[in-house]
């Protein structure tokens, strides 16, 4: 069993920004092992647990496959055989697909560190198109990181336009749209 810090906490630390939520990824473990260690399972659709002392989130490594439209209809597969690289591949942006192991070593199979240095928001894989909520997430990140000089990669913008033209945003619920818009509006640069 190997535990990694993933997502925004790693990204923000590398940018020298305050870290928010600390999400952890667990590779090589089962639900039963996590429960035996005292974790509390909170995820319905995929195995997410709360640490018994810190209450931070720990998710088992998983892959996702889309079956349907909108941001629902994902089939998640979590098992001890899912690798770190497979889990990171399902993430939205390269800058969010960086993991830090317990020894402080960074694992960056998709070029997130280089994109941080270049100030580029780029999708990890074509699977980005499977979740239209990611369009709004990219808009939120573009607004949030505008002051640091970040731009959306041309190929990511093109993919977002294709998704919009295909009507994918129409499949989002108003609650999910509002949640993302609220995060933009409450940010430091909502006008971007």
Curated annotation (Swiss-Prot):
Domain of life according to the entry: Bacteria
UniProt keyword list: ATP-binding, Magnesium, Metal-binding, Nucleotide-binding, Nucleotidyltransferase, RNA repair, RNA-binding, Transferase, tRNA processing
Pfam families to which the protein is assigned, alphabetical: PolyA_pol, PolyA_pol_RNAbd
Residue numbers binding ATP: 8, 11, 91, 137, 140
Positions with a binding annotation for Mg(2+): 21, 23
GO biological process: RNA repair; tRNA processing
Top EC class of this enzyme: transferase
Stored InterPro entries: NT_sf (IPR043519), PolA_pol_head_dom (IPR002646), PolyA_RNA-bd (IPR032828), tRNA_CCA-adding_enzyme (IPR050124)
GO molecular function, one term: metal ion binding
Gene3D superfamilies to which the protein is assigned, alphabetical: Beta Polymerase, domain 2, cca-adding enzyme, domain 2
Chain residues that bind CTP: 8, 11, 91, 137, 140
EC number: 2.7.7.72
Cofactor(s) this protein requires: Mg(2+)
Catalysis performed (reactions): a tRNA precursor + 2 CTP + ATP = a tRNA with a 3' CCA end + 3 diphosphate; a tRNA with a 3' CCA end + 2 CTP + ATP = a tRNA with a 3' CCACCA end + 3 diphosphate
Similarity field: Belongs to the tRNA nucleotidyltransferase/poly(A) polymerase family. Bacterial CCA-adding enzyme type 2 subfamily.
Quaternary context: Homodimer.
Its job: Catalyzes the addition and repair of the essential 3'-terminal CCA sequence in tRNAs without using a nucleic acid template. Adds these three nucleotides in the order of C, C, and A to the tRNA nucleotide-73, using CTP and ATP as substrates and producing inorganic pyrophosphate. tRNA 3'-terminal CCA addition is required both for tRNA processing and repair. Also involved in tRNA surveillance by mediating tandem CCA addition to generate a CCACCA at the 3' terminus of unstable tRNAs. While stable tRNAs receive only 3'-terminal CCA, unstable tRNAs are marked with CCACCA and rapidly degraded.
Name of this protein: CCA-adding enzyme
Organism: Aeromonas hydrophila
Organism taxonomic ancestry: Bacteria, Pseudomonadati, Pseudomonadota, Gammaproteobacteria, Aeromonadales
């Amino acid at each position: 069993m190997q535990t990694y810090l993933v997502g925004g906490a790693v990204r923000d630390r590398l940018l020298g920004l305050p870290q928010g939520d600390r999400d952890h990824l667990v590779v090589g473990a089962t639900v039963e092992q996590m429960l035996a260690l005292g974790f509390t399972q909170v995820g319905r659709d995929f195995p997410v647990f709360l640490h018994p002392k810190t209450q931070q989130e720990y998710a088992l490594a998983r892959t996702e496959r889309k079956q349907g439209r909108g941001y629902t209809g994902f089939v998640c597969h979590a098992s001890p055989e899912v690798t770190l690289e497979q889990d990171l591949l399902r993430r939205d942006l390269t800058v969010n697909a960086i993991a830090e192991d317990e020894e402080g070593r960074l694992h960056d199979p998709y070029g997130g560190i280089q994109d941080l240095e270049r100030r580029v928001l780029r999708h990890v894989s074509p699977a980005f198109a499977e979740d239209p909520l990611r369009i709004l997430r990219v808009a939120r990140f573009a607004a949030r990181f505008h002051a640091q000089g970040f731009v959306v990669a041309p190929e990511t913008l093109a993919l977002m336009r294709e998704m919009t033209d295909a009507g994918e945003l129409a499949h989002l619920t108003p609650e999910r749209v509002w949640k993302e818009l609220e995060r933009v509006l409450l940010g430091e640069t909502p006008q971007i």
